[in-house]
């Protein structure tokens, strides 16, 4: 079945490109998730007036790749114990999270996070929440690292 999941882990450019490099993923786009204001802009998000998180909407076929595999991949490139920071990206918009529009799916995600907690001495800070809203980011953010291969990325994509 074709499904969508929303992931956050620092700057959305890197997370999007990381999953775009995976042949099992159908498509991605980047946006602002769970904003307190309608139609936020990048400037709004950076000025801390939205409480939105930079996120990637990931479309996948659960017969090809499981949600648990997607979460395992995310945890390979984030520090889930860090609060509002990934690499050089600092701010609430850079928090880590896994978001769904399905409350039953949230329970499965939380179970997976509880299992992964055994691998960490510090508490996992990754949010697990329902999607309240999701606004596409500006076009120049979409597939940014494909358009700008030498652009900034907090993930070492060459090592992946």
Swiss-Prot record:
SUPFAM superfamilies: Peptide methionine sulfoxide reductase. The keyword ATP-binding does not apply. Belongs to the MsrA Met sulfoxide reductase family. Keywords: Oxidoreductase. PANTHER family: MITOCHONDRIAL PEPTIDE METHIONINE SULFOXIDE REDUCTASE (PTHR42799:SF2). The gene is msrA. Has an important function as a repair enzyme for proteins that have been inactivated by oxidation. Catalyzes the reversible oxidation-reduction of methionine sulfoxide in proteins to methionine. GO terms for molecular function: L-methionine-(S)-S-oxide reductase activity; peptide-methionine (S)-S-oxide reductase activity. This is Peptide methionine sulfoxide reductase MsrA.
